[in-house]
């Protein structure tokens, strides 16, 4: 029997959830409020618009948890990964995309799908119970009326953190007599050559002057949001500078793995990297340079960077507030709201962090909804998989800071990482049986974790097809 499943929100999570529902033969109705109502971060009415970076991060499925997540999503027929692969741009070992082409591909695929209906307009308040099963994937910029409805239903306050956007520079305004193309350690990646980033070097004097300017620069006022924490994975560059004069050169401006071909014997104190932002190669974004500086200060301070003295900005950085649920308290293991099980949540509003993670949670929300509609609930995903580890963190991670009833909540937005995976039962050893140490141990451990994940996902998929739970693979 065909089921109508409503999806509120047409971002990465909502788009992926709708695709999974539609591909399973059910009807997906996407409710997207743009362009009827905009947000402080979105610029278009396209589905799956990327509002921050254009990078999906590492595409390495052997040594990186997000690369493994890419692989798992591809194996489950992810629309988001298909569109990313089709619209990739050079980015070293990362998977980066032409943001406009990517959004257009997702929008086109959903608009043309016979099982998808796209409704433009805001859902004011909670979805009506008459809708039946519904997936709420409204993201970190959930409209006030819906956010208030969620709070009223759950009796819980959503937590919040700031998110900052990095500037984008016109390629032809970058001084190529100063900057050079190189990926860190010359590492190639999907669609790349090993020389995919533009690098702008700084001497010690230039770096110290730049850091001082960041600290002293005029910032956007945000008194109404005081006390709201930042997510460490998206700290504004000036906040990093305020943490200490050496923070940036050991973070986004680290010079390791890069050599200036014009002066190969002199090691820069720091390097600013820019990554291709569109397929034409005409736009580059400043890697790690999310900011809450005022627009005029951004232009002044960022033009202090060697090679960017005459930079023309296609987009300046900005600041917005993100909100997310206390998901371990509010959601069950299949992302249903305990207070109203007909509602599922997906994407960043659940407390995952990152484009790929948001889409991954949307993928699983769609599959959970389809399985429930068919009367064949899915077995829990093995936590040994990237998808399972992410869902387990969202639905079961960190209820209390110290276990006390009145303690503050410690649940925070999280990127997928190997720390979310169950430990291996046996420490990795080499071919001779010797226990390993250092980098060799770390590399082999990651390989063992990814091998286990692939085996366990294959068993889970077989069980899902058979409609029965299967045991996890042996270590």
Swiss-Prot record:
<keyword id="KW-0819">tRNA processing</keyword>
<keyword id="KW-0285">Flavoprotein</keyword>
<keyword id="KW-0520">NAD</keyword>
<dbReference type="GO" id="GO:0050660">
    <property type="term" value="F:flavin adenine dinucleotide binding"/>
</dbReference>
<keyword id="KW-0274">FAD</keyword>
<dbReference type="GO" id="GO:0005829">
    <property type="term" value="C:cytosol"/>
</dbReference>
<dbReference type="Pfam" id="PF01134">
    <property type="entry name" value="GIDA"/>
</dbReference>
<protein>
    <recommendedName>
        <fullName>Methylenetetrahydrofolate--tRNA-(uracil-5-)-methyltransferase TrmFO</fullName>
        <ecNumber>2.1.1.74</ecNumber>
    </recommendedName>
</protein>
<dbReference type="InterPro" id="IPR020595">
    <property type="entry name" value="MnmG-rel_CS"/>
</dbReference>
<dbReference type="InterPro" id="IPR002218">
    <property type="entry name" value="MnmG-rel"/>
</dbReference>
<dbReference type="InterPro" id="IPR004417">
    <property type="entry name" value="TrmFO"/>
</dbReference>
<keyword id="KW-0808">Transferase</keyword>
<comment type="function">
    <text>Catalyzes the folate-dependent formation of 5-methyl-uridine at position 54 (M-5-U54) in all tRNAs.</text>
</comment>
<keyword id="KW-0489">Methyltransferase</keyword>
<comment type="similarity">
    <text>Belongs to the MnmG family. TrmFO subfamily.</text>
</comment>
<keyword id="KW-0963">Cytoplasm</keyword>
<dbReference type="InterPro" id="IPR036188">
    <property type="entry name" value="FAD/NAD-bd_sf"/>
</dbReference>
<feature type="binding site">
    <location>
        <begin position="9"/>
        <end position="14"/>
    </location>
    <ligand>
        <name>FAD</name>
    </ligand>
</feature>
<dbReference type="GO" id="GO:0030488">
    <property type="term" value="P:tRNA methylation"/>
</dbReference>
<dbReference type="InterPro" id="IPR040131">
    <property type="entry name" value="MnmG_N"/>
</dbReference>
<keyword id="KW-0521">NADP</keyword>
<dbReference type="GO" id="GO:0047151">
    <property type="term" value="F:tRNA (uracil(54)-C5)-methyltransferase activity, 5,10-methylenetetrahydrofolate-dependent"/>
</dbReference>
<dbReference type="GO" id="GO:0002098">
    <property type="term" value="P:tRNA wobble uridine modification"/>
</dbReference>
<feature type="region of interest" description="Disordered">
    <location>
        <begin position="427"/>
        <end position="447"/>
    </location>
</feature>
